[in-house]
């Protein structure tokens, strides 16, 4: 509060007969971008807990403003209300886990809270900027220090530094991490399914006593020159629109699960049967000579693998509006690979090395018609089906 008083003597009592002027309140609100950032975290399955040195009433007001708690929720715990760590059992421990806001918390209590959540199976990220935050930043699975106002001790103890001191950056970083993880999965599944198809193609042709449908140098050409470009283009994807609407990945599970290996094998088998069917049609129905049939088989495998990259989109996304279709690098890679495949077919020196010949009009019609079969199957599955979970 503010008040005034006129005195004739400087030694007069300063606290009597004052004229009240008014109350002065200091407001230090959270940044406007924090609330939507917290909402994004919650949608992404990330639980946000506020630990502050402010008084409980102040912490509760900020928590309501940020949407962490409702006005009816009075669940704010002060440090003095928390029992010693070794005494926390049963209902007391459950109350701690349900609490969204902690006020007047001591540094040692921060360590205890982190330990409680970690033992509950949570991956804990901790933000901080002061020297007192350093032990908690070090103990957390991910310590996040402030880059502008953070102390050197806090920054050295952290795993990550927010250069802009902005909470909004955290969900952005989480999204980038999820996109990278998703792109790695796509890269591995695509490249391995293409390689599996090449292995199965030679294996099945051998046990069926068919002529070799693809030559060793042609396989090497596909691996080194063509399918590698779409694979790398997948790593530049921007992720699906619902990337932050999914729960976090279980850190105890491998990046490529048994289900992914199964899907890879299924894709490889579909690609193999398509190429083998094309080769059989060329030899037995169209009665094309072996040299030209091998070229048709080689080109079918090349185009099958190129169209197959479009099957790497996520489930239940739209055919023409998904993270793969709008990836401009995918289309550049497909265009470049088609150009290289045409060079391998028609460029005199290269075609001689790879033993390719002009497939002719009927050959091209067969190639283009058969090569889209795996794409059609994949698109139907991704649109109307769901991810296989055989080994969960």
Briefly describe each language-model feature range.
Residues 70-125, 140, 145-316:
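Membrane-embedded transport module
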Residues 137:
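Basic, alpha-helical nucleic-acid-binding regions used in initiation and control of genome expression
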Residues 1-116, 120, 134, 148-149, ...:
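Cytosolic catalytic headpieces and adjacent flexible linkers of membrane translocases
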Residues 42, 52-53, 187-195, 362-366, ...:
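Hydrophobic alpha-helical segments characteristic of transmembrane helices
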Residues 14, 255-259, 286-293, 322-325, ...:
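Membrane-interfacial loop-to-transmembrane-helix junctions in polytopic alpha-helical membrane proteins
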Residues 299-392:
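C-terminal transmembrane module of polytopic membrane proteins
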Residues 48-52, 126, 143:
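Conserved SAM-binding loop
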